[in-house]
Amino acid sequence: MKKQIVITAIIALVGSSIHAVSAQQTNVGVNSKAPAKSSNGDVAQSTTVNDPADTAIDVETIEAAMVSAVGLGKPRNNMSSVMIIQKKDPIGQQNLGRDIPFLTQSLTNVITTSDAGNGIGYSGIRVRGSDATRTNITINGVPINDAESQGTFWVNMPDLSSSIGSLSLTKGAGLSTHGAGAFGATLAIGTETNSPEPYYQIDQSVGSYGTLKTTLKGASKPIKLSNKETLYINARLSEILSNGFVDRATSNLVGYQTSIAYEKKSQKPQGQNTNQAGMEQLSEYIKRPKKYNTNTTQIKFLAFGGRETTYQSWWGVPIEKYNMGLNPDSNHLAALQNHYLRNTGFSGATYRNSIDSANLFNSNPNKYNYYTYKNEVDNYQQHHQHLYLTHNYTSKKNNQKQLAATLYHTFGTGYFEQFRYGDAFSKYNIPPIRMAADSNITVLLSASDLVRRRWLRNNLIGVNLHHTISVGKDWWIFGLGANQYYGNHFGQVTQILALPNPSSFKTHEYYRAIGNKSDVNAFVKYNHSLTLGRNNNTRGGVYIDMQLRKVNHVGSGTDNDLRNFDFKGNFLFFNPKAGFQLQHATHHHISGYVGVAHREPARSDFTDNPNGAVPRPERMINGELSYLSTFPALPTLNGKSSDNHIRINAYYMHYKDQLVLTGAVNDVGTPLRKNVDVSYRRGLEFEGQYVLWQKDYAVANHSHFERNYLHLIGNLSVSQNIIPNSKVAWQDYATGIPVDTVYKNAPIAYSPNRVAALGLQGQIKKWNVLWLSKWVGRQFLDNTGDVSRSLNPYKFSELTVNYTHKFRSGTSLAFKAQCINVFSARYVSNGYTWGYMYGSRDITQEVFVFPQAPRNFLVGLTWRFSKG
């Protein structure tokens, strides 16, 4: 029932005091210099090269263990996929209420969008043109993508960013993982780890368009059950309110998270302290692995989720209406009138009454919302429960091992409500209703304005098992996962407004359908470390990753339009992957990767497929070749710095039977797709950082160092995204027969050939500033390459400022502010289209777009009270 959103890519060099430089499909750091510490305890602008000989299991937290098993392999020596990792504090500095996709805008080849226009509500990301169904999302290793639609709906998990310990994103086929697996990008999320001290925190943000965010969170003092056993408890409660930029696009979101964790350690790791480094261990490539001599056991229960009520804004703005905001001249008015005349005056017309007409012609062209009914809302709640177990131990042969298991359950229920104008009862299998016209006359009512609700109720139950073994220079992970999904779709007519007492109408169910899906997968990952060269100055490794996945998906019943359907999809996929990484003389890194990925069709591919075609599963062969150079020392304004780098990545993604977006959407806003025989994406990605100025200084009686700096950061992607033979069927409404047209070398929809970002990132003592400018090339809305059905190139800029003051008592106060779309650029970042013929070969097209807000602001305060 949810509208598809998109989310993908690699976390870029954003945040106040931490960046991890890495190469796609490698896992190497960039500097042997000891890191300076920032005021928030993060590693500031410095990382180190891993020692490939270090293969001990060093993941101490449950969250790190689960992310490591399915997303990274070994965190400090994983040859299979290296990504840039964004840690908690940089996330928090940008977390003023906007959805998670907008925390990732600086990423290479990434596009973000918002239906409401201000980043709250339904939001999404695309990477390399890939949509949400290609992005595998996991939270502590648990699959989050909806099993049927394959998308991820962040609005169902309000303010999840306030509970994140890390985000790690990669592009391409990635690694074996649970759930549907990556088909374009991978996002592995780790939640916050156990707090070593008690605290409570209040976050309050306000901003444009009535935005108000309140977050309360805290942790208890660790409860010592014995010298070896500890109990941890933490919780969060959040509320986000917004009116949206688009008319009536309100959001009322409530989210929560709570956890209780048990930890038993019989001995400290040798040579290390026992501070809770949490998920930071994954991004700080600077510590020797911990060697465990005794057992460590952790058990944790995590619950999170929320409730969302959002007014629908997924219809978009007709392009003729949007153009009126640019220049309301007679030509644009005539175009809008023609659009209106094409879509009114017949059964099922878009514009059904005087309210629709007045709304179309009189509303603000930039903020137009098709929906006017006061309760045209999406009302949904989703609840997740996870139970984790990890056990680290040393075998008799002194091999490091880890067992990990996760049980999980996701429950969701809700509906969206719709007002329908003059609908015939026959559409709902409602017999005519006899009612009194006056005291002597009765009439037979067969049509009326009415209110309906379309429901989704679903459950997902699953288990993940992992066994990790470290033997010398070899590293093994064995994984097994299984889950079962149960979905119920049904619709109800709740009110018939022509009745004297509409609410007296007994709720009538007019359709019901089920969808059940099972997913079983098993994988093995093997890494082998290498040391090469006369002086052993070339290090690296090779890896192989193999997965077998079995999917069974069945659906049957009646759809919203009373069509009966019954589909079955049984798939068996083998997904092998392999690669290498080499590091020479500290400053040169090269890596290569090739992987195969498969993806089954989603529910809507079966139920909404054009012309009744049976969708086929997709296959992708992904190749990546990456070079990373970290310069030993380059001049800055006040000396030299070794924290500069440049990365060049070449990729090729070859598809067989890719399900590409057609540009059209169904009646709940889900993008429609169809198979194309052969297609490909290929491109070059450039990322870099240059240190303009930096200075380290000692604080707190030289107890630690902090770094002031000013960095120039940027990225650029240049790509081709092509369907060699794109066959489009245009419906001819005069004959009722579709007309096939083949477009040669057509660009894949929603896949711009150019995406770039440039920014300045600086920290001066308690102040942190980030300026980011983003450029996005033309996006075609269908697979024809017709400019009239495309989104114009656009650019925007953002400014984020943070100030943090810590008191001796341990209390801290942080001020955060964002200016979004600084220059008030007028642009649209998303849209959809469809076209048809009527007795001739001329194509009549309808294009709808989603405008983004002009200059707007968010400001916030964070009070954190903890032991000093």
Each language-model region and where it sits:
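Short acidic/polar hinge/loop motifs at secondary-structure boundaries
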Residues: 143-171
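Short strand-turn segments of transmembrane beta-barrel domains in outer membranes
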Residues: 171-176, 185-222, 235-249
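Extracytoplasmic beta-strand/coil segments of soluble accessory domains associated
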Residues: 101-143
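Gram-negative outer-membrane beta-barrel transporters
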Residues: 532, 635-641, 652-654, 672-783, ...
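N-terminal periplasmic "start-of-domain" segments of outer-membrane beta-barrel proteins
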Residues: 23, 41-54, 59-95, 124
